[in-house]
Amino acid sequence: MATTLHSFIDIFDTTFGEGPEAVQLKTIIIPIIQRDYAQGRKGSDVTRVRGRFLESLYKAVTEKPITLDFGCGDIDVEGNMTPLDGQQRLTTLFLLHWYAAKKSNISEENYEFLKKFSYETRYSARYFCIDLVDYKPKFKTAISKEIVNQAWFPLDWENDPTISSMLVMR
């Protein structure tokens, strides 16, 4: 089995395999069998781990790249990847890229790859990711409060553990 390094951005343009079995990755779909996104949970242990992980990601962006070892999953013939391991890291990278794109106010074509990341754990998480990519925050208040106050955000989404964890990561 060959191992190659990819950024979260370029993985969507990568072809895996060779010959007639080669397939270009089009989407990453967190499957229904995966647990909820947990890196945004509250609690001292999770907060400590999250802080260390975010610090590592910050250093990777500002200093030296790091390897996150998350490339384990199946890719079907249509190019849809269902990760078997690394869902937490992939979701954090999705959120990091979303935040950086929106904060930097880059053009939509430069962050369209985020639309290729999806959740199947429950419909609310799937639609939250879709709506989040389209949302243009103002950054005048806490981003999580700003998101929750949007017309596209149903109040019952606050009860979805994946969404509430994503909001903590902001």
Task: Write out the residue ranges for each language-model feature.
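Glycine- and hydrophobic-rich flexible loops that cap the catalytic core of alpha/beta enzyme folds
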Residues: M1-R170
